């Protein structure tokens, strides 16, 4: 029977990040394929395609996009792997950012034809703040792509991280012949599409004269020159990888499965067991026998038939056991978690035990909030808070049918507690109308869809001009007396704090100039 340390040591928990359509969902499914978690890979190809394994919400199946973060666990070569699949659509939510807080490392998928794109930059920034290892998979090499050296240079320039090519592509598109593995000094030949089946590969050394016969003299010479050029660059540094300052780069084609298995094997070899987390009492030993976890995501109505609400927890230390009494630090209550579940998108499975590094979902009766800490009785430390990100888009929202006020309030509050939206109110006003703020505008569509389908409430939604929000730390006057510029408003959150919403950074100067005692703070909290 494995020891606690052995079980924890085989855990690998990582997030996959990318810009829309870079191939993230396809790569995720190929990982699951190798782990035996799915029998075949189903690629997302727009609205007519079958729904991908990691897309479970109805709106995701309709649109062929991921708008919530899925959690998937599978076994492979002795490792227990937890994948946090983040939305790839350009409009995403705070849920995406928070999911990255539960990961120990990240896989960054880049479209070989497009390079570094806007959402990649946003997600990378969150990973970089945590200094977690970031591995790069440059995808779609079976199509026409940009120069591979140019792509690596762009990653370094745009993202501020060094790169080291673990393998090197031989051509691209119709000329794509395979990749050269620099460490093993071998060539894996690309043999065309495999459509979800495990790929067969041929191997030949770089110095082998038969390489010229196989690739052609010109292509073989080009490969030898490029590999020699790479050899004159920086050395591989494992410590830099683990510090998040050097990204190992792999080339391949997720759609055809080429390069996916070698990438997964190298990724598992280079990553470490779950990392220790910081609490208000210092760093918590991941191998401690005492269970502890934090809530990073709340999702309501994953199963519409059950009207349930799940809190997703990242286990940070020790071993979780079903039906054992634990302690919810924020409320001071003891609780018994009798139906812990692991996920494969919307598919669930009750688990009897789980270890540090694992993600479990537990039924939430309304007790949990994002960032909460759960420990064994007698331990009262709290893990560092989960960031709150400033919303960039705002709408005034009210129910079309005033008789549905109760459902409206319940729905907006529950969806806000999940972190998909932030809700505010006009000071002194009731809850018949709220201001909704989001990070990405798609969340308005998701919010409207869920309110109608889960709470039976049709909404009246009016766009507002604000794109910034600041917390009022102090002021010399009553909020009603603040001198406002055009396109600014005083709001209140549900912790009764006052905030200023406004249009454009220039407004800060106006507001502070005309309100001498006004002190504004960034709403981001960690």
In which residue ranges do the predicted regions lie?
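Structural and coupling elements of P-loop NTPases
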Residues: 1-526
């Amino acid at each position: 029977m494995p020891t606690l340390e052995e079980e924890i040591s085989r855990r690998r928990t990582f997030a996959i990040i990318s810009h829309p359509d870079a191939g993230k969902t396809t790569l995720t499914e190929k990982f699951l394929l190798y782990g035996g978690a799915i029998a075949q890979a189903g690629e997302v190809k727009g609205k007519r395609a079958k729904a991908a394994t990691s897309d479970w919400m109805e709106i995701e199946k309709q649109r062929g996009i991921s708008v919530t973060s899925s959690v998937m666990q599978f076994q492979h070569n002795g490792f227990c792997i937890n994948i946090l699949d983040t939305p790839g659509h350009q409009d995403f939510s705070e849920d995406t950012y928070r999911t990255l807080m539960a990961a120990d490392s990240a896989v960054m998928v880049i479209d070989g034809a497009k390079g570094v794109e806007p959402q990649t930059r946003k997600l990378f920034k969150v990973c970089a703040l945590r200094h977690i290892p970031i591995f790069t998979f440059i995808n779609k090499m079976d199509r026409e792509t940009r120069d591979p050296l140019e792509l690596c240079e762009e990653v370094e320039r745009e993202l501020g991280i060094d790169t080291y090519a673990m393998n090197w592509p031989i051509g691209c598109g119709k000329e794509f012949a395979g990749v050269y593995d620099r460490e093993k000094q071998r060539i894996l030949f690309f043999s065309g599409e495999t459509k979800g089946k495990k790929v067969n590969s041929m191997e030949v050394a770089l110095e082998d004269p038969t390489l010229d016969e196989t690739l052609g003299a010109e292509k073989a010479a080009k490969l030898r020159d490029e590999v020699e050029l790479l050899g004159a660059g920086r050395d591989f540094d494992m410590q830099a990888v683990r510090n998040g300052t050097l990204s190992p780069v792999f080339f391949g084609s997720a759609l055809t499965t080429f390069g996916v298995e070698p990438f997964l094997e190298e990724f598992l070899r280079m990553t470490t067991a779950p990392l220790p987390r910081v609490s208000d009492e210092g760093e918590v030993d991941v191998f401690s026998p005492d269970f502890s976890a934090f809530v990073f995501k709340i999702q309501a109505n994953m199963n519409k038939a059950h009207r349930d609400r799940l809190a997703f927890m990242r286990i940070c230390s020790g071993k979780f056991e079903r039906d054992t009494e634990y302690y919810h630090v924020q409320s001071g209550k003891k609780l018994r978690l009798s139906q812990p579940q692991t996920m494969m998108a919307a598919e669930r499975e009750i688990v009897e035990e789980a270890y540090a590094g694992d993600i479990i979902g537990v039924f939430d009766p309304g007790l949990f909030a994002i960032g909460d800490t759960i420990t064994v009785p007698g331990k009262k430390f709290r893990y560092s808070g989960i960031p709150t990100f400033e919303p960039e888009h705002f709408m005034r929202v009210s129910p079309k049918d005033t008789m549905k006020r109760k459902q409206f309030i319940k729905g907006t509050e529950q969806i806000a507690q999940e972190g998909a939206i932030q809700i505010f109110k006009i000071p002194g006003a009731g809850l018949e109308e709220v201001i909704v703020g989001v990070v990405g505008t798609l969340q308005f569509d998701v919010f409207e869809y869920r309110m109608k389908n889960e709470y039976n409430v049709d909404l009246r939604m009016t766009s507002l001009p604000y794109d910034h929000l600041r917390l009022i730390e102090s002021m010399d006057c009553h909020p009603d007396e603040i001198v406002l510029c055009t396109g600014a408003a005083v709001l209140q959150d549900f912790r009764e704090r006052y905030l200023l919403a406004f249009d454009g950074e220039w407004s800060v100067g106006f507001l502070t100039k005309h309100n001498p005692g006004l002190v504004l703070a960034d709403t981001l909290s960690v």
